[in-house]
């Protein structure tokens, strides 16, 4: 396919993997615990950080709490399955649950200050790393806290075949639009309703 190298290069623009060992925490962003948390466990085992911190998303359906559907319960189950005894903490939300990467950045900044962290690695899906890192760097500017990013891959698509799946197309087309919005904002857009 003549277009495959171009589409792969486009996808690679969105991926950042600049995490270094010695971080205070691996911060797993919400919205993809099934891929992001196992990646954080790998990084924990490789000595990147001594703890894993989960962000606190706003639940779409509060009734699911009793079923163990929140991300902390899922992370606990994944940790048990892996056999890795990584400490898991939850970063409390400043406003009743994060609805965006900007919300998570503000929440994590407050958490880092309270715990005197100097270096964190955010763990998210590979296609989300550039925008997530950009949002965190904007919010963390002047804090003297170093922020890095590492991406998690999934079993459905990669940067080399994303255009062959609905989920890959959705991820990479939407990510471009989201990146453009994040360039101009430092918080959730007032015209976008996040629930």
Where do the protein language model's features map onto the residues?
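A transmembrane-helix-recognition feature enriched in membrane-embedded lipid enzymes
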Residues: 165-192
């Amino acid at each position: 396919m003549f277009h495959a190298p171009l589409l792969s290069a486009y996808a690679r623009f969105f991926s950042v993997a600049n995490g270094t060992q010695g971080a205070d925490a691996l911060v797993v962003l919400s919205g993809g615990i099934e891929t992001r948390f196992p990646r954080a466990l790998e990084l924990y085992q490789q000595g990147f950080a001594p703890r894993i911190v989960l962000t606190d998303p706003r639940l779409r359906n509060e009734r699911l709490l009793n079923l163990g559907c929140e991300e902390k319960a899922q992370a606990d189950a994944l940790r048990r399955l892996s056999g890795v005894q990584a400490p898991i903490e939850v970063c409390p939300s400043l406003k009743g649950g994060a609805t965006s990467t900007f919300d998570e950045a503000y929440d994590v900044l407050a958490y880092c200050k309270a715990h005197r962290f100097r270096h964190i690695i955010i763990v998210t899906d590979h296609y989300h790393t550039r925008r997530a890192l950009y949002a965190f760097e904007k919010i963390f500017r002047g804090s003297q806290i170093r922020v890095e990013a590492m991406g998690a891959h999934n079993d459905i698509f990669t940067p080399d075949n994303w255009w062959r799946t609905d989920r890959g197309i959705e991820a990479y087309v939407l990510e471009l639009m989201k990146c453009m919005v994040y360039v101009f904002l430092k918080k959730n857009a007032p015209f976008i309703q996040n629930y």
